[in-house]
Amino acid sequence: MAAYGGDASSAEARRRSKLSAGPHHRDRELAPLDKDRILSCLGTRWLGRDLRLFAQLASTNELAISLAQKGESGTVILAEVQTRGRGRLSRHWESPSGGIWMSLILRPDIPIALAYQINMAICVAVCRAISNLLGLNPGIKWPNDLLIGERKVGGILMEVQAEGKRLEYAVVGVGINANIDPSAFPDDWMATSLSREVGSEVSRTALIQRTLLEIERAYENLGSKEIYDEWRRRSATIGRMVRISANSGELVGEVEDLAEDGALLLRRDDELVRVLAGDCIHLRGMGGL
């Protein structure tokens, strides 16, 4: 989530080599994640009680989907490193050591049309965990990026399977740049990390525990006005000039509000357009580029 890219060019390969050997891997050397430590003080009732920790995976979401197809529920897949992590629109998602890369298997009893409630709740929950543990105030860039100021610190990727009009399962990937040196990434990736923002290494164990607890609480409150209100209040997109790329084409305008169903309300001249999905780019400043 820290950054997206396409096919690896030679320059990209050099950057990934730097990511593998750069200063951000200090956290893994000094404090690798330990399953027993995470579980020992985990405050959840059901989420993450089946926790599977890997030194390296291609993609936590890929494994979680295969387990969800076998009936798993509440399981959390956690990896120190992802080699083929992905973000929205199948973009590459850099997942070096020092971050938190995990996927959750959820089985909400809701229609597929209400799946947006899950994304909304998870975004709010991760923001709450970061805020409560570290005193930072993350914003949410529509639809699922987490920002500190203008820089990306995390993100959510939800993949769902429906049975008729009902949701069979949702696999939700959560990526957080915890102890990663953002200077390892190109400036145009606009990344930051929690350790950079607080000025010291953060406890990934404590953050995982708090994040899972907040997710469980928010998930059990799906569809509530409380979740929507906080999601809207934390928006880093309302009031911004944006460019939206969707299947129907490209839209540019000012974001007037976010609807309760997760739609972005975009003002274009005298027209208010509802956007349910798409790639959102914040344009610089209120007036655009």
Q: How would you label these PLM feature ranges?
A:
Residues 2-5, 12-132, 154, 202:
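N-terminal lobe of the biotin/lipoate ligase/transferase fold
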Residues 3-5, 14-29, 46-47, 112, ...:
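Long, positively charged amphipathic alpha-helical accessory segments at protein N-termini or as interdomain linkers
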Residues 75, 137-141:
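A short coil-to-beta-strand element that immediately follows conserved catalytic motifs
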Residues 82-84, 142, 172:
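Short conserved micro-motifs on helix faces and helix-strand junctions that flank
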Residues 145:
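Conserved active-site carboxylates
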